[in-house]
Amino acid sequence: LEHGVNVMLEKPFTVTLDEAVAVMKAEKKSGKILTIGFQPRMSENMQMIKKIVESGELGDIYYLQAGGGRRHGIPSPFGTSFIEKETGGVGAVGDIGSYSLDMLLNAVGYPKPLTVSGYTSSFFGTDPAYYPKHPEYAEKFGVDDFAAGFVRLEGDIILDFRISWAMNMDTAGDALILGTKGG
């Protein structure tokens, strides 16, 4: 941006709020385009969902559900850089949750959040038994392995969110978009 070119960043966009503010200021100052590389946003299915929402076929959107995760899927086979706060920084929310959130919010035009309530935990990541070959990884685990959130959005829309790297089931739920005429 500072060199006068458009920029595409891979997720995570940034790790801290301060970094995000600095990048957004740089974009505004440069007059160039900044986009984040969320590949699912550009998929044929997501483009179709966005068109359906925009057409009004679903009516007024009032509820979004974003869920997903992995059964025992903390990314650690290649060392600890992904699970340490200093090097990975984002945990399950930033790794896989960001895709779920982006897909739904993109489909409904990114309404402004009004209130946010959230919870994160690291029940599995900090348990040495989770890493039978490398129990020392548990000591280095510094990010979330589960998160849940509830966001009240502009337009009287509710977003219910849950994501996990490590759970004892296959999914934390599907993506849902509910409107007054369909869903």
What kind of feature is each model-predicted range?
Residues 1, 24, 50, 101-105, ...:
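Non-transmembrane alpha-helical segments in soluble domains
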Residues 127, 138-147, 152-183:
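NAD(P)-dinucleotide binding in Rossmann-like oxidoreductases
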Residues 18, 44, 170-172:
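Residues that form or flank phosphate/diphosphate-binding pockets in enzymes
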Residues 8, 33-35, 65, 117, ...:
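Structural detector of well-ordered beta-strand residues that form the stable sheet scaffold
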Residues 40-141:
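Predominantly a Rossmann-like dinucleotide-binding segment in NAD(P)-dependent oxidoreductases
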Residues 1-41, 56:
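Beta-strand-loop-alpha-helix segment that lines the small-molecule cofactor/substrate pocket
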